[in-house]
């Protein structure tokens, strides 16, 4: 079991019950999934770019990503329907907890000029979305092996009913929000 999962059950969950006055432990917000998405627009011109992006995403997530394709043709972007334009991974269960642990303890502290995560990135239903500008903040990525610095989107989906509950849940995991 991941340390953060144990921490959730032993300390975070009881604290949330006290803070919000839940009558059942099933009402306590929990993290349902973490989705990683990497848009690779350059893959239209060069097929090798997509292979590198898939390799990086596999190393970071620990599971094989799904290639996302263009839904419709856009002449301005020089893409046609069905062209591969990115990749995504949905993490649940054990891998999700392990990724969250690496994100909070290792990756976020390695972000350059970091001043805290924005509180405005909640969507109104307790889910948190963040962008990462470079994949090299993750320890699994070897700096010598990358072809290009790429960013990605990370969405943490929770069962919280509102942003206040979602923020309290993530703060329980020592998520570094701006004060």
UniProtKB/Swiss-Prot annotation:
UniProt record similarity statement: Belongs to the universal ribosomal protein uL5 family.
GO molecular function: rRNA binding; structural constituent of ribosome; tRNA binding
Protein's organism: Shewanella piezotolerans (strain WP3 / JCM 13877)
A Pfam family assignment: Ribosomal_L5
Subunit structure: Part of the 50S ribosomal subunit; part of the 5S rRNA/L5/L18/L25 subcomplex. Contacts the 5S rRNA and the P site tRNA. Forms a bridge to the 30S subunit in the 70S ribosome.
GO biological process terms on file: translation
Known role: This is one of the proteins that bind and probably mediate the attachment of the 5S RNA into the large ribosomal subunit, where it forms part of the central protuberance. In the 70S ribosome it contacts protein S13 of the 30S subunit (bridge B1b), connecting the 2 subunits; this bridge is implicated in subunit movement. Contacts the P site tRNA; the 5S rRNA and some of its associated proteins might help stabilize positioning of ribosome-bound tRNAs.
Gene3D superfamilies linked to this entry: 3.30.1440.10
UniProt gene name: rplE
PANTHER family xref list: 60S RIBOSOMAL PROTEIN L11-RELATED (PTHR11994)
Alphabetically ordered keywords of this record: Ribonucleoprotein, Ribosomal protein, RNA-binding, rRNA-binding, tRNA-binding
Name of the protein in question: Large ribosomal subunit protein uL5
Single GO cellular component term: ribosome
Signal peptide: none
């Amino acid at each position: 079991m991941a340390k953060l999962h144990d921490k959730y059950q032993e300390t975070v969950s009881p604290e949330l019950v006290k803070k919000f006055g839940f009558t059942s432990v099933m009402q306590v917000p929990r993290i349902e999934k973490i989705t990683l998405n990497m848009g690779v627009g350059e893959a239209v011109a060069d097929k090798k770019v997509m292979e590198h992006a898939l390799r990086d995403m596999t190393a970071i997530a620990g599971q094989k990503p799904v290639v996302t394709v263009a839904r419709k043709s856009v002449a301005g972007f020089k893409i046609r329907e069905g062209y591969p334009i990115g990749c995504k991974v949905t993490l649940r269960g054990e891998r999700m907890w392990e990724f969250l642990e690496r994100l909070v303890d290792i990756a976020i502290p390695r972000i350059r000029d970091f001043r805290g995560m924005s509180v405005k990135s909640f969507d109104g239903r307790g889910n948190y979305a963040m962008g990462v500008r470079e994949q090299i903040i993750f320890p699994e990525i070897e700096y010598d092996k990358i072809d290009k610095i790429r960013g990605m989107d990370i969405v943490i989906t929770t069962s919280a009913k509102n942003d206040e509950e979602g923020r309290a849940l993530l703060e329980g995991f020592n998520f570094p929000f701006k004060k």
